[in-house]
Amino acid sequence: MSLDNDINTKKRKLQDDEKPRKKRKHKRPTRDDDADLDVEAGLNRAFARMDGQLLADHLAQKTRRFGTELSSVELNDLYISAASIRDSSSFEKDRTLENLPSFLEKFAQEKEKLDEAPKKNGSPHTLIVAAAGLRAADLVRACRKFQKKGSPVAKLFAKHFKLEEQVAFLNKTRTGIAVGTPQRLIDLIEHGALSVENLRRIVVDASHIDQKKRNITDMRETMMPLAKLLARADFKERYTDEKKHIDLLFY
């Protein structure tokens, strides 16, 4: 090989070495809870096994993930303690719409009649929190067992219902069970139309997943309002209060 050819070969090798190497495509890691996602049933089965501590940790992790604009103090105000959450892992049935009445009955107070409404208008004993209006409508239908004349299940979500209509409904109607989305429930409480005076339990529809395998804690637009709703001072102080206790349950 001539000297010129040898020099040209070395130049080409140096040029090849200087070319940026193509990055290897990494496969997207599988979600830790993929095994618990039952798409056919529309359930994330992990929630059925979580006790108060696991749920508190899960909520804190999601709040930190979506609350990036908040200070550490503001985030801390949104955290819920394990002691605030009632353990419902003893419920053995699938957490489907059909089994919601059984769940409510299992964790109701002794001799409590869920189809009866407190005497004060707009003051339910049970709040059920859903991710979206369509799901909330399904939950309302699932609770028909507890609906009777003088105690309708309240529909407190934005889809097809204006805030003013719901304010008017609550002002003139007694209701035992109310189903709503986080932000609309906050708006109605702050408006003064939805009273929490007689509230005995909050049930978060957590196991349900949508077609994209997301539950109420998996989306910023639902998780952050949920965190703010559950961490309200008038709720937080009652999670561990014996006299005016509120059960916080995750279905």
From Swiss-Prot:
Its main location: nucleus. It is found in: Nucleus. Keywords: Nucleus. InterPro entries: Cms1, P-loop_NTPase. Pfam families: CMS1. Residues 1-37 are annotated as: Disordered. GO terms for cellular component: 90S preribosome; nucleus. Belongs to the CMS1 family. May play a role in the regulation of DNA replication and cell cycle control. This is Protein CMS1. It comes from Chaetomium thermophilum (strain DSM 1495 / CBS 144.50 / IMI 039719). The lineage of its organism: Eukaryota, Fungi, Dikarya, Ascomycota, Pezizomycotina.
